Amino acid sequence: MVQNNESVFFVECDSYKESPSTSPIRLDDLDGNDAVSDQGLAFDGDVGITSQARVRNPRAQIFEDSNTDVVLHLDDLDMVPLNTKFDMQMEMGSPMAMPAETPPPVEPLKTKDLAYSSLAHLPSYFFEQTHFRIDRKCLLEMSKLRRNYLTISKQDALSCPQLHSRVAGGYLKPVKEKLFGIRHFLDLEESNTVNLLQDGNYMTELFNSQINIPTFKEFREDFEWCLKIIRDRSLSRFSEKRLQYLVNKFPVFQHLHSKEEMRQSKKVPHKDFYNCRKIDLNLLLSGCFSQWQLTEFIWTKLRKEPDRVIHQAFNGSHITLSQLFKVNFEETGQFFNGLKIIDDSFLEWYKVIYLAKYHLVNDEMEIHTGSHGKQLRYYLIAKTFLEFDNYINGEYLAELLKTFLIKPQEESKYQLCQLSVDFQFYLHYDNSDVDNWWMVFANWLNHYNIFSNNIRWNIRISRIYPELYHTGKVKNFQEYLNLIFKPLFNAENYLHKSLGPILLKFLSQVSSIDLCIQDTDNYIWKNFTAVSCLPKDWTSGGDNPTISQYMYYVYVNLTKLNHIRQALHQNTFTLRSSCSPTSMNRTSQFSNTLNFTEHTEAILNNFLLACGGFLNAENLWNAPPSLVYLFYLSQIPMVVAPLNSIVDSKPTMLQEQAPTGLVLEPSKPYKKNPFMKFFEMGFKISLSSESILYNNSYTKEPIIEEYSVAASIYRLHSADLCELLRNSVITSGFSSTLKNKWLGVSLASHDYFVENTGFVDKWYDCKPNTSLEHNVPIIRRQYRSSTLAGEWRLIIA
């Protein structure tokens, strides 16, 4: 097998260095003069080339790790060939690259800015005079522009004060409350509290202060400048080649270092996928429990309280539970069996009709006068069990949340979530002291004690200005914005004797505001009003403002709110947005001179204005390559829900009842989701279960199910899963104090590994090796860091 004058080297690499840390082991020395014949090789259908001898060679040299009791055999080590010029050329991504004769020495990981790394050791290939109509450095300028917008709006992590005291043990310490405010911790002792809310004059002056925010004209100019860059053909071809290179580079890394990754993972005691923190970043309140859980809960209530009054009609008549589930059915004296209570027909109606038409704007008069039979029954089921503002004050929904979400998460300790709730545009309430959604929802959470240390809240804002305008609830776009943000700018709401502390407590657990861009959004314009007009002047006959108008004015109000909350030493909010698949077929009305789709408009707005991340990130796959490449370079957080995207939404009879312009997305298989491609390239991506009610989940741990399905289909191993979990934690809305406990990272500068997220937040490792907290092998993090640094060096060369 091996000639006497040639040797194959097997090298054991140190966990924190890429260079060999031990002397090479010659295969000749292992064979010696033994006359035993070499073991042959055979082809196996599943594995490939495998040894005929299933038992490890007893003559193989054994290595003992001094730090642990792990015994390593030669078969457990990666085979590292001697470096050649060809190997270095392939690592650079081009066979024409001529590497330096003497490679630079490998230095230990130190804190440094990846965008401004030294270029002294780069080969001449990186400095080739390639003709670009637009310089590649414009990508760096776009990232700087993004950082400028986000720091102005106080969305960066450094602008968010700590809301938790120091963590004791492995559990979260409850947040302490007091009248007129909440005890806030800025890495100080518990006695150093801030109670600025007691001064009403200071509050009024603070809420009326002016902030220097880029004007709409300046934002529009920046948007069009960025659009011209990402549409450049040569830059698009360059970005496409780099993305393809990143996709192909990761499998090569795994083939060369998979055993070393496995060895490093095994060295971490008592830390694997199941006992690493995992956060669902976009779990919807409207679907946070499964179909069988909802059915089981309804049957329990039917058995225990069948005569409970759950609804009162406008004519004064009452409807009980037993009457609700006998509408339009013969009186047999028996209830229906099994899943017939919550079947696919109801779920389809709930998703297509109720959430789009009745959920956001409460108009019971319309449903009672225009609906009957099955549709009325479906409406009452949704209103009774899936809403917090109803005749029974949301008692059933609170019980569902506590039973199937909060209690299991608190018991598991390692599962957390960011729960997304829709902002509902109600204009009046029975309680005269409460005239806005914020206080009603906060009061509901407090009444049923739904606040949990394992849950943070996202507020979803829908683009339903046309519906509100045509029903007479708003007269212009400014009134639409006032419904959302005016209660938060009213100092009297915070000084309210009973509801003020409750509102503060709720806002302290809100992490982000999400702008939802959906297929059902009104698209057709009738009056082409100039987009540069002020929101108070936008009536436009009910035409829906562009995505950029929504994003900019939500950004402006969020910026003002964050400045106020930071001055009061309260947590700040981030902005997130999504994108619908059908927007690729819709031309944007935002620019008078440039032609582009709403798809590109939504993604570019997210890049410029949103720090919280990009939702439904599978839609990024069809974006311009330069924009996709920018998302990688800036390490913008992305959230995908592969299981939720394969739901079959074929047209049915409900399509006739759906809102005008609804386009149902065709079903697609799991592997069509580009999630794995994004992960291989190195995007800051994480998984979410999103809506458990629709994806046929039959387990009590849906986020575990989501990761398990991905691991089964893509054959992910421990390092892959733990890297995804770490992404979900570091990009979440939980405080940096908790991230320090869970991941060993801090915003304070250290001399160890540094990780940039969103091109705005720098997270520093607090010790040389943090694998004990998250079990991501250091060699995997080295690969991600060096690959990203190489791409940045190529950009600024």
Curated annotation (Swiss-Prot):
Keyword Hydrolase applies: no
Subcellular location: Membrane
UniProt keyword Ribonucleoprotein present: no
GO cellular component: cytosol; membrane
Membrane-crossing residue ranges in chain numbering: 627-647
Domain of life: Eukaryota
Matches recorded under Pfam families: AMP_deaminase
Keywords per UniProt: Membrane, Transmembrane, Transmembrane helix
Cystine connections: none
Membrane topology term: Single-pass membrane protein
Family: Belongs to the metallo-dependent hydrolases superfamily. Adenosine and AMP deaminases family.
Name the UniProt record assigns to this protein: Inactive deaminase YBR284W
